[in-house]
């Protein structure tokens, strides 16, 4: 019951709508995969996920939901997948849209298990194309990073990248525009990522929601500054932990 109340409070404070730009790039998909894997570091199936195998167990069910959500492909309002965006991602990567893509359309009950059941056959039937479309093959991912040197490289800490070349200013007079984005406190449009789960870093959902609320009347990279300062105020070690993890997200 407490978990339900917490969830309702969180949603009432921050809302459930978000609309990320599509297609997603290799940095954004890499963050999604690594973030969801890190949130379940003790899972027995973790090594299977690295190989893009999704066994039928409870941890994997929630890993699948996590990935869809962090790719911007799960609509929390109607509890369904954004099939149009999946198609857009395939098109952007010159990958043929799978014939069975409509099998994953329509609502779920929102549980990890139901989302897994809804999508696992589609995943298994198209895993190689999905890996290509979402940069899930190391060679393709590395090629993208090489071609996009304005993005934080793999193996580089967020602090090292963002403190160089005045990146923290965000093209304005901000202080944490770059870091707040790469810590994924905000998205590429400086909108707070309301579902960001920092519990394992000592930031509760209620605390994060209060940061989102504090940023409500800010504009542009001032939203990023507000989110950064608020999270740091709640737990000064949280962002340091993220920074130490950031060479591999």
Curated annotation (Swiss-Prot):
Transmembrane segments: none annotated. InterPro entries: PBP/GOBP (IPR006170), PBP_GOBP_sf (IPR036728). Leukotriene C4 binds at residues 52, 136, 154. Residues 1-19 form the signal peptide. One of its GO terms (cellular component) is extracellular space. Keywords: Disulfide bond, Hemostasis impairing toxin, Platelet aggregation inhibiting toxin, Secreted, Signal, Toxin. Gene3D superfamilies: Pheromone/general odorant binding protein domain. It comes from the Eukaryota. One of its GO terms (molecular function) is odorant binding. The keyword Secreted applies. Changing residue 100 to D: In population from Kenya. It is found in: Secreted. Thromboxane A2 binds at residues 49, 63, 154. The keyword Secreted applies. Coiled coil: none annotated. Disulfide bonds join 36-66, 62-112, 162-178, 174-221, 211-230. One of its GO terms (biological process) is sensory perception of smell. Belongs to the PBP/GOBP family. Modulates blood feeding of female sandflies on vertebrate species by binding and sequestering different mediators involved in the host response. Binds leukotriene C4, leukotriene D4, leukotriene E4 and U-46619, a stable analog of thromboxane A2. Does not bind histamine or serotonin. Inhibits platelet aggregation induced by low concentrations of collagen in thromboxane A2-dependent manner. PANTHER family: GEO07291P1-RELATED, ODORANT BINDING PROTEIN-RELATED. This is Long form salivary protein D7L. It comes from Phlebotomus duboscqi (Sandfly).
